[in-house]
């Protein structure tokens, strides 16, 4: 999510502009983020309106590809924002800022609103058992995994390695004949 004063833009991981497809996110940003200039790294998650359970990514991919009847899709596939990092704030790049300070900055500007926007849950621990319990609870809540980050780590644009590690369950192998 990019914001520069009144201009708000939403981009996919591949830098596709999807602002038009997510008018609800634009409203969440205006209402719940207390800053007029930022770039936030986040995930958009679809959820079932009745059960409030997270949907798989394929559910929101319908909205990403949608060019028409957007308001209908907003109702059909409600979403929420889960913010996990901030790269730019009030005219200043935070790329060289340690993750712990970036996270504090992120927490300071977001007003969590259930089923609209939230900062990803986190813990700081050196205890393996505590980390394991956090991971298992994340999976039970419908998350696909957790990110493990170095509190002193800087942000590396476009990189999936360095100071972060994504932990997901290992899929069982399949024996298939095609």
Model region roles, listed by residue range:
Residues 2-177:
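Catalytic cores of nucleic-acid ligases and guanylyltransferases
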């Amino acid at each position: 999510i990019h914001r520069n004063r009144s201009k708000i833009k939403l981009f996919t991981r591949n830098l596709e502009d999807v602002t038009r497809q997510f008018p609800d996110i634009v409203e969440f940003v205006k209402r719940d983020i207390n800053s007029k200039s930022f770039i936030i790294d986040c995930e958009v998650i679809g959820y079932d309106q009745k059960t409030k359970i997270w949907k798989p990514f394929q559910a929101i991919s319908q909205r990403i590809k949608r060019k028409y009847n957007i308001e209908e899709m907003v109702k059909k596939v409600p979403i929420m924002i889960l913010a996990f990092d901030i790269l730019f704030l009030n005219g200043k790049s935070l790329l060289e800022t340690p993750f712990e300070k970036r996270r504090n900055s992120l927490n300071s500007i977001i007003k969590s609103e259930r089923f609209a926007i939230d900062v990803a849950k986190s813990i700081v621990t050196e205890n393996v058992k505590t980390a394991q319990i956090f991971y298992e609870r994340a999976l039970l809540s419908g998350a696909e995994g957790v990110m493990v980050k170095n509190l002193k780590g800087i942000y590396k644009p476009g990189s999936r390695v360095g100071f972060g590690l994504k932990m997901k369950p290992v899929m069982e192998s399949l024996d298939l004949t095609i």
